Each structure stands twice: as structure tokens, then as C-alpha cells.
Amino acid sequence: KAHFHVDGVQALGKIPMQLEDVNSISFSGHKFNGLKGQGILIIDNKEKIEPTIFGGGQEYGIRSGTVNLAMNVSLVKAMEIAIQNLNELNHRLSRYNKVIRECLGQYKGMYINSPENSAPHILNIAFPGVKGEVLVNAFSKLDIMVSTTSACSSKREKLNEVLLAMGIKDNRIAVSYTHL
């Protein structure tokens, strides 16, 4: 039986989650208004995980080091608020998404790749014939911050191999809205 891990970084506070068949899931605090540098790893069976940092045995022996109680408490509070406000946030982001789609729909030669019924907090758009870097610069002059990559892969020189395999070119940008 394979270990089923879910990268839930974009999920917490944005989509309802059912974790019955998940062996592990990870979240990043800053994606739901926690502090940067915080994360959560939930594992169904901690015996399956080998520690990478050895020492005092904190964090159930999986990650030794002094526990930052203040950061942990703030992370739990941010998580509670994100889950509590999920429906309200999705309603607001759906409205933003609709307005942005309507505005972008006025421009010829521009494609919205995200389906109408997709997650309301992410929008993938393409401008055939225009490189992503040019789009980022043009939008930034309008004080609209967009990216051609995720923050965790922004140092890469080339397009993500998975996106290339999906036939996605470098003329697309992804817009993700957060807890505004």
C-alpha cells in the first residue's frame, strides 16, 4: 500500500477537506494568515517517518529542537479563523474571480484557462505570443502583482517540467487570491 501524502498548502481555509484516506498532509501557515516560517505536518502513523534532525526528541522525535510555543499558538488561531471563515471567503473570492473574468474577457487574444467552476482563489490566464516575463512587468506597472511561477519555484530558470508535459507554454500566468 502506497503512502498517500497531500500537499495542502493552498487548501486550508479555501476548500473543504476530507482526510479519511490521507496518510499525511502538509500546510503552510502564511497561506492562511499565519506567520511565515510555520508549517503543519499531520501524519496518520508517526512510526512511518524517520527523523532528519536528531536531538532532544521534541515533536514526537520527528523533529528535535525547542518548540516555539508562541508561534504554534498563533498558527492554531490562524487555522481556526481560516476554517471558520471558509464559506465567507469563498463567496467573496468567487465575486472577485467573476469580476476579473469579466474585465479580462474584454481583451481579444487572451484566454482564461481555469474552468468557470474551478477553485475561486486561483485563475490561470494566457496571452498567446506574449512571454510571461513581459506580462509580469506590465501588470506590476498597474500595481497588480502576478507571477509566472509559484514562490517556491521562482528561482528556476526554465518552465516546470510538469507544466511542459501538460502543454502549458510560458505565456501563461497564474493569479491566486488570498485572505484579502
Task: Tell what function each PLM region has.
Residues 123-173:
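Conserved C-terminal alpha-helix-loop-beta "cap" of PLP-dependent enzymes
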Residues 69-80, 101, 136, 140, ...:
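Predominant activation on well-ordered alpha-helical scaffold segments within soluble catalytic domains
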Residues 83-135:
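Conserved PLP-dependent catalytic core of the aminotransferase class-I/II
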Residues 25, 109-113, 146-150:
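A short linear hydrophobic-aromatic micro-motif
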Residues 178-179:
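Conserved small/polar residues in nucleotide/adenosyl-binding loops
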Residues 1-28:
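Conserved PLP phosphate-binding loop immediately N-terminal to the Schiff-base lysine helix
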Residues 21-59, 64-76:
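Active-site PLP attachment segment
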